[in-house]
Design a protein with these regions (language model features):
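Alpha-helical secondary-structure segments
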Residues: 135-142, 173-177, 219-220, 248-249, ...
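N-terminal lobe/hinge region of extracytoplasmic solute-binding protein
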Residues: 61-113, 144, 216
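Ligand-site clamp/hinge motif
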Residues: 237-284, 427, 436-438
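Short, well-ordered beta-strand elements
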Residues: 54-64, 107, 117-120, 139-143, ...
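Surface-exposed binding/hinge segments that line
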Residues: 50-53, 121, 155-201
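Aromatic- and charge-enriched surface segment that lines or borders ligand/interaction sites
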Residues: 107-152, 175, 261-264, 322-324
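Detector for C-terminal structural segments
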Residues: 2, 41-44, 227, 334-367, ...
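Gly/Pro-rich hinge or "lid" segments in bacterial periplasmic/extracellular proteins
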Residues: 96, 190-245, 249, 379-380, ...
Length: 622
């Protein structure tokens, strides 16, 4: 955690030729654009496999561990970014304007009049890296596995929950029959896997896909090696239908300490570093051969409360503080949080104060609470709310309804400096209410999270242009089947009204009506107090301009490089000083851009659906 394109919408014949021509000119203009229109950075090292010249290696520093290479279960942002490089998706977001769709594995599509049957044409020029052809049967098998195997639903089950039947009448035709209309049918942000490989996997839920290399895929890169918490290595897929990447190797190298990653960038040991702190970004400003990219963020950063962990079978588990079951208590906590201070002091201006659930980058879905509804910073009101709700203060300590002092456990990510910095403020602000806060920062927050063993936690998901996945995280269907299972739930929310609104928005094809429903969902989520958005942090990243000549940001204006809804950044990247080599074989040069233009022309000719796609883990937990 998607796109727009033909389908249930009226096709407009007039203007298509003009629009296509304009789009071609726009994209051709991209080719001639100065380097400032892109990001830059890459490195060179040993000789190429053929012994000719030096090998161009693009090295990306990452802080988040890649816990699995299984596309059915990957939800971490680091892992879902790898999936986009390894496997093709049915459709792609346009890198210049993510509100538009481009063909991916599917070259075109159509829908029945009742919008319940979707037929996709699967391209005939895609090949698995082991030499076998990609067919519609691979896509049908992928979706059917997700429909019938609970383990395979973990990452993207929301896409198939409404599927009735998926078939492949022939190698080039995929047919999906729905139970009811579904607005995300051009946003099926699902990695399609090779049936002949995955049918051999006995337990999808436990399979990590990290033992046999290279991993068979059909994306722009082929994963050749992985060592947990050390690196992930890729080589370019020379047979990728959109054109081979220009770099000889792409390496994601793990740095637990982001200061060490920044130091490596300065030394030229890595090409690119994401998720910079304000201090790190400031230290790089003006540095030779280094460019800092400060892009509008596509994720939210929030506080999530434990509302009482439970499973679909009704069993409760975990050990969340019982005071958090009280909406007034939750609201009081958030009245004591000064979001402006968080933005000014922790983010140092590299972000926007939190309000609704969807970041302001997505204007159609961005929601603000009314003045009367807003949980504004007001410590006096927070204290009054606690008093009124029965949480009295005695001797400077806030007591629960059993007369015991309240201590809350705050869980944070050890690899995220923002969490650590913000926790100090929260401890102070809640301490003024008489509530003690014990902060624990962990390398892996996943285990206590799924076990429901926390009170409050720092939470964050990347949001795609279509918000379906981050909304699905809070439905009853996202709960684990039993306490021993892992669901897609973010923090165990299950509410009939929210579920009803979710069902309405997924079935609504009218963009404005759907957006209104989504905003109603955001309003409910805000009022519930189950979670509260602190801020929308910018994507602050840096790269070496003496290593990468050009790289595509998404969107083109004020866009990010890391965590895109697609593979555009690494696929398009061109080595500095290697123009002749980079342009051969049609990588990220003019031929590739023209290829995107041609694909966009196809999309324009088919129709324009409002974007409905999901993730880079689209909406992946961070």
């Amino acid at each position: 955690m998607h796109h727009p394109e033909s389908g249930p919408f009226t096709r407009l014949a007039r203007g298509i030729v003009a629009a296509a021509a304009a789009l071609c000119l726009l994209l051709l203009g991209l080719v001639a654009a100065p380097a400032s229109a892109f990001a830059e950075g890459a490195g060179s090292g040993e000789a190429t496999p053929d012994g000719k010249g030096q090998k161009d290696t693009l090295t990306v520093a990452i802080a988040q561990s890649v816990d699995t290479l299984n596309p059915f279960t990957a939800t971490r942002l680091s892992a879902t970014n790898m999936m986009r490089l390894m496997y093709d998706f049915p459709t792609n977001y346009d890198p210049k304007d993510p509100s538009k769709v481009l063909p991916g594995l599917a070259t075109k599509w159509k829908t029945s009049e009742d919008k319940l049957t979707w037929t996709y044409t699967i391209r005939d020029d895609s090949e698995w890296s082991d030499g076998k052809p990609v067919t519609a049967e691979d896509a049908a098998w992928t979706f059917n596995k997700m429909m019938t195997d609970d383990g395979a639903k973990t990452a993207n089950g929301n896409f198939v929950a409404n599927f009735d039947k998926v078939t492949a009448p022939d190698d080039r035709t995929l047919v999906i029959k729905l139970k009811k209309p579904q607005a995300t049918m051009l946003a099926l942000d699902v990695p399609i896997v090779p049936k002949h490989v995955w049918t051999k996997v006995k337990n999808i839920a436990e399979f990590t896909n990290d033992k046999d290399f290279p991993i068979v895929g059909n994306g722009p890169f082929i994963l050749t090696d992985h060592k947990t918490d050390q690196y992930v290595k890729f080589k370019p897929n020379k047979k990728f239908w959109r054109g081979a990447p220009a770099f000889d190797e792409l390496v994601f190298r793990f740095y637990k300490d982001n200061d060490a990653a920044v130091s490596a960038l300065k030394k030229g040991e890595v090409s690119f570093v994401p998720d910079l702190t304000p201090a790190q970004a400031a230290s790089l400003e003006g540095a030779a051969n280094i460019k800092v990219n400060d892009a509008a963020g596509k994720r939210f950063w929030a506080l999530a409360t434990n509302p009482g962990a439970k499973a679909k079978n009704g069993k409760k588990f975990g050990n969340g503080h019982k005071a958090l079951l009280d909406a007034d208590f939750r609201k009081a906590l958030f009245h004591a949080v000064d979001r402006k201070t968080i933005v000014d002091k922790v983010l140092q201006g590299h972000g926007v104060e939190g309000e609704g659930y969807i970041p302001p980058r997505y204007e159609d879905y961005f929601w603000k609470p009314s003045a009367e509804q807003k949980i504004a910073y007001d410590p006096k009101q927070a204290a009054a709310l606690l008093d009124k709700a029965g949480y009295k203060e005695k001797g400077g300590k806030r007591l629960d309804k059993d007369g015991k002092p309240i201590t809350l456990r705050l869980m944070c990510h050890a690899t995220d400096p923002k969490d650590k910095a913000a926790s100090k403020y929260l401890e102070e602000w809640w301490g003024e209410l008489g509530i003690k806060t014990k902060t624990t920062c962990l390398d892996n927050v996943g285990d206590p999270w799924v076990a429901g063993e926390y009170d409050i936690a720092f939470d964050g998901w990347s949001v795609n242009p279509d918000p379906d996945l981050v909304l699905a995280l809070h439905t009853c269907d996202a709960l684990p089947n039993t306490p021993k299972d892992v669901g897609l739930t973010d923090n165990f929310i299950c509410n009939k009204k929210f579920d009803s609104l979710y069902a309405k928005q997924i079935a609504e094809y009218d963009p404005a009506k759907r957006a209104a429903i989504v905003k109603d969902m955001e309003s409910w989520l805000y009022d519930s107090g189950y979670m509260n958005v602190l801020a929308y942090p910018n994507s602050v990243e840096a790269y070496r301009t003496d290593q990468i000549k050009s790289i595509t940001a998404m969107p083109a204006s004020n866009g990010n490089i890391w965590g895109q809804d697609g593979y555009w950044s690494w696929w398009s990247a061109k080595p500095a000083g290697g123009e002749a080599k980079a342009s051969s074989g049609g990588s990220s040069s003019t031929g590739m851009i023209i290829g995107i233009a041609a694909a966009a022309v196809v999309a324009a000719g088919i129709g324009g659906l409002v974007l409905v796609r999901r993730r880079s883990a689209a909406d992946d937990r961070e």
